[in-house]
């Protein structure tokens, strides 16, 4: 079967997203910012213009990392926080929550180090990710922030996929449709 693509213009950057089957009836556009500094920087700069004031950014491992890093760098080398997919030996007093993502077929957990959790207490936290689809990963990050005593001041992503584009609490740059099995956008 020939690979199908979905063409997008994201803040002036033209990209062709390969379509990948999610199941026998549905495909998604694969959006990957790893290794794409032009797109990452352009998206980070535009999101910074649109998001509310915040004290810290938090993202989930792994695809949100380049975006959070670049947003923090552009905002003056601010510290950002990372929810890991697995606990690390150096992490102490870990907070963790479970998450189900559209791109994984099993339950996952997100973990935040106790020091980062302490940083969030009473602070305005901006949750950032590359793509929001079902909102499950976003919900897991919200739970971590709330358990740490942080104040969620906003949620931002590059692409809002499917129904996520209808969320009133989400700042995003572009809509990404879901696709039928033939690769046609479902709008």
Task: Please state what every model-predicted region is.
Residues 1-54:
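Active-site-facing substrate-recognition patch
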Residues 2, 7, 139-187:
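PRPP-dependent phosphoribosyltransferase catalytic core
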Residues 54-61:
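Short glycine-rich phosphate-binding loop at a beta-alpha junction
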Residues 55, 123, 153:
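Conserved acidic residues
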Residues 61-67, 134:
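Gly/Ser/Thr-rich loops at beta-strand to alpha-helix junctions
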Residues 67-75, 141-142:
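Short Gly/Thr/Asp-enriched flexible loops that form oxyanion-binding sites at enzyme active sites
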Residues 76-78, 149-150:
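A short helix->loop->beta-strand "cap" motif at the edges of active sites that frequently abuts
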Residues 78-125:
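Short, glycine/charge-rich flexible loops or terminal/linker lids adjacent to PRPP-binding catalytic cores
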